[in-house]
Design a protein with these regions (language model features):
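Post-His helix in hydrolase/transferase enzymes
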Residues: 519-520, 524-542
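Flexible "cap/lid" subdomain of the alpha/beta-hydrolase fold that forms the substrate-access gate
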Residues: 321, 325, 363-364, 368-511, ...
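Membrane-embedded alpha-helical segments of integral membrane proteins
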Residues: 128-194
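Conserved hydrolase catalytic core segment
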Residues: 338-381
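Conserved HGGG/HGGXW glycine-rich cap/lid loop of the alpha/beta-hydrolase fold
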Residues: 262-311
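A short loop-to-beta-strand scaffold at the N-terminal edge of the catalytic core in hydrolase folds
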Residues: 245, 250-262
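Active-site loop/oxyanion-hole signature of alpha/beta-hydrolase fold enzymes
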Residues: 306-344
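Intrinsically disordered, low-complexity terminal tails of fungal membrane proteins
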Residues: 1-61
Length: 548
């Protein structure tokens, strides 16, 4: 009996111990995982309305971080744009590539617009905005690859513009991914707080999405235009320079210098040195001299492209008459072309010819001014001063552009649009044979090129102060001078005849002043004007007239 009671007591003791082990142990709230606590709270609270602010993806920490990054990119691109804008006025180391134009500014603006579009109503993602962003980044990636593989374009764009293309490409891709991540965060919040993904859109959201997609379409169109212009420029590289690209200014950039005939040997005839006009390249202007060369009347001649014109690279600011003339003198020294020279200058090229002659008097045989500019045209208001008659600047239309503030403002606007290449691309699309590579590089479409417009802007910035003072100090007295003027310009403009008369009196040895009849500003385009122009040049260089 004693044994039985002992066993019974042991069993009851074991039962009590096992029941104590099976009982739940109290758990502190701090020991429960945060996700489980949050899930429990969500189960206890009622589902929220989809429009409730608490459903916003910005309540998620990772989305708020993306918002901070996107906002930071706006300021980064804004600072980049300001630096690139300042580099158009001042030479900043590292920001002066050989083919410097307005492309860098446009790329910075595109990147800024992409970031602004993303930041505008950040919490409202748009699917088609994201798709367009992927297409934009793909186009820019193709641009980068093409520009990198085509050697002349790679050298022209330099590290700066190539980096900007890559930067905008990455910006577009990253902002599209931001839109995807925000949408994922939005769905996550909706499932957690409303129980389902909300597919309906409010009117305000639809309006926001519409403008976001519209903004992305505009960005894509801009990038497409830039891409097409870049691809056409790559195609145009098959058109080789006529002469040599000579490095100048400590090898910072190159100017195009092309000579025909024996310019290093001895001859009784001087080297005819050609200066083009404001909107006319030396290649286009020299055709009447080329004709004389083929007829063995002009033995040798040289043409060159000022920075930004034709085949030449862009120059760092500033670009005054004297500074550009120094580039020409350096190129001639490097090519060991010593003269003597007969300088022919058309339009504003007459001022460059005058500057070159004044700095190389011992090497100058003669100067021919072809409907040349007066220094007054370098001033903001060319009709100021004694003996000048006030007239509208519209009288210069289709002949030249004055250096006033309105023209300067228009040039800058044209500059910002120029990387899109709308008109040249349209010309190429409609008339590919008529508007060929030659037309874009040094022909009629040259005036739409971004580097040309930038050169004009640089020329305009210092024209009224630096260039004007330089040309007024230029002395060509006692040099043999010939002047030919358009009768059309003299009859049309109140001051043109007086300006041409003043040019004819720059030297005591002015041999002739010829009025080309039935000729507009571009004298060589009319048969009679071309004949008079050629005969005058032949007389200046000591040759017999060959046309009767």
């Amino acid at each position: 009996m004693t044994t039985y009671h002992s066993t019974q007591n042991e069993q009851s003791s074991n039962t009590e111990e096992s029941s104590q082990d099976a009982a739940p142990r109290p758990v502190s709230p701090s020991e429960v995982p945060a996700d489980d606590r949050e899930a429990t709270q969500l189960e206890l609270q009622p589902l929220l309305d989809p429009d409730d602010p608490r459903v916003s993806p910005l309540k998620l920490e990772r989305i708020r971080l993306l918002k901070v990054i996107a906002t930071t990119l706006v300021y980064v691109n804004l600072v980049l744009f300001v630096i690139l804008l300042v580099s158009q006025f001042f030479a900043i180391p590292g920001f002066n590539n050989r083919g410097k134009s307005f492309l860098g500014l446009d790329l910075a603006l595109v990147s800024l617009f992409i970031n602004l579009t993303t930041n505008w109503f950040f919490a409202v993602p748009a699917y088609y905005e994201r798709i367009l962003g992927y297409i934009t980044s793909g186009l820019l990636l193709i641009d980068f690859i093409v520009a990198f593989l085509v050697s002349p374009i790679r050298q022209s764009l330099g590290l700066l513009d190539l980096s900007l293309i890559a930067w905008v490409c990455l910006n577009s891709l990253f902002n599209s991914l931001i839109g995807y991540w925000v949408e994922e965060g939005k769905h996550y919040q909706e499932i957690r707080l409303t129980g389902r993904i909300e597919k309906r859109k409010t009117i305000s959201e639809l309006v926001i999405i519409f403008f976001k997609v519209l903004g992305e379409i505009i960005i894509l169109w801009i990038v497409w235009c830039i891409s097409l212009t870049l691809w056409i420029n790559c195609f145009d590289t098959h058109e080789k320079p006529w002469g040599k690209l000579v490095p100048v200014n400590n090898n910072q950039f190159r100017v195009h210098l092309a000579c025909f005939g024996d310019v290093h040997g001895k001859s009784d005839q001087p080297i005819v040195l050609v200066e083009g006009g404001q909107s006319t390249s030396s290649e286009a202007f020299q055709e009447w001299i080329e004709e004389l060369h083929h007829l063995n009347k002009v033995e040798r001649y040289c043409i060159w492209d000022r920075p930004g014109y034709g085949f030449s690279d862009s120059a760092p600011p500033p670009e005054s008459l004297g500074i550009v003339t120094e580039y020409l003198m350096e190129a001639l020294r490097k090519e060991k072309i010593e003269g003597p020279f007969s300088v022919v200058g058309f339009d504003i090229g007459g001022l460059y010819a005058r500057m070159f002659a004044s700095r190389n008097r011992a090497k100058i045989q003669s100067i021919l001014f072809v409907d040349s500019w007066s220094p007054d045209l370098l001033k903001k208001w060319p009709f100021s001063g004694s003996g000048r008659k006030n007239e509208s600047t519209k009288v210069f239309k289709k002949s030249l552009e004055v250096m006033d503030n309105i023209t300067g403002f228009k040039l800058w606007l044209r500059g910002f649009v120029s990387p899109l290449g709308v008109l040249p691309n349209l010309h190429w699309f409609l008339h590919p044979m008529r508007f060929s590579s030659k037309s874009r590089i040094f022909g009629r479409d040259m005036v739409y090129l971004s580097k040309y417009i930038r050169a004009r802007c640089q020329e305009q910035l210092v024209s009224g102060i630096l260039s004007y003072n330089e040309i007024m100090d230029a002395d060509i007295n006692d040099l043999n001078v010939g002047v030919i003027s358009s009768d059309f310009m003299i009859k049309k403009l109140l001051n043109w005849g007086k300006w041409q008369n003043e040019i004819s009196k720059l030297s005591r040895k002015t041999s002739e002043w010829v009025i080309a009849e039935n000729s507009d500003h571009f004298i060589w385009n009319s048969p009679k004007g071309r004949k008079e122009l050629q005969q005058l040049l032949l007389r200046l260089i000591g040759e017999q007239e060959y046309l009767k």
